[in-house]
Amino acid sequence: AGRASDASREYVARARRGNSSKGVRFSRGGDALAKTLDGMIEDFELDPASPPIVQERVAGDGWGVSCLYWHGQRIASFTHRRLQEKVATGGTSTLRVSDAHAGMEADAHRLLDALEWHGLAMLEFKHDPATGRHVFIEVNPRLWGSIDLSLSAGVNFPWLLYLAHTRGPAVAQAHFQPARQGVVARWLLGDMIRRLDLARRGQFRTALTFADGVHADSFDDAKWDDPLVLFGEGFYYLAKGLRTHSMNPLEAGMVR
């Protein structure tokens, strides 16, 4: 509370239950932060007894350490670094690369070990290249939006989860192989939405720069062996956009 009263610091206010970047607002400390919290409680009809979580804003790249545990036993682990995100304020990544970071991985495993975790989880971190410092952000206890990257890099979490459940954790662990490093995956439709968001913010040149210098090894939603995924996803977003007049709408129940 003492640090949050410092008006020179920047903070992130996050609803306790949100959807990607929805339910997240940025603010200076002190009176500005208090006003932001009051505004979130009113706008999202939150319970004042469960106000948004306040975290100090941290600069740096977004990383994720994804794991499968079985009653406290680690079965598989995979690390990726975010290169682009759907909207400027954060949220789902549209471009990311398989990578490794020993410090983050050790911290993630230490936390899940202590919790005797069971099931899937992705732990998010921020890493500041200038200082080498990394900071833990949150745990997502579910399958994650960038699951295609782990599959493309050789870590099939759904299959390993199935094996752990049907044949036991030892069998699942025997099928795990460390990920190939440097594999890049792009969410094609999400990248289009990202460009629309940039254009909406007046960054037209960036929005229209299609050659970003990154070669994708895989696309989340464009597969030769399953081509209807892209069409189905496109139809879903088009219908939602026509209904809500937004490509990233806030719908009932998303933030609470």
Q: Locations of the language-model features?
A:
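A conserved helix-loop-beta module that forms one wall/lid of the active-site cleft
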Residues: 1-23
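Phosphate-binding site of ATP-dependent enzymes
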Residues: 28, 34-90, 96-109, 126-127, ...
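A short catalytic or substrate-binding loop motif that flags glycine-/basic-rich loops and adjacent residues
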Residues: 17-18, 57-60, 71, 116-119
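Peripheral (often C-terminal) accessory segments that flank ATP-dependent C-N-forming ligase machineries
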Residues: 163-256
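Conserved metal-phosphate-binding beta-hairpin within the catalytic cores
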Residues: 113-148
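Glycine-rich phosphate/pyrophosphate-binding beta-alpha loops
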Residues: 18-21, 83-88, 92-95, 140-155
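Flexible, glycine/charged-enriched surface loops at secondary-structure junctions
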Residues: 53, 118-122, 171-179
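Feature representing long, continuous alpha-helical segments
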Residues: 106, 137, 155, 159-160
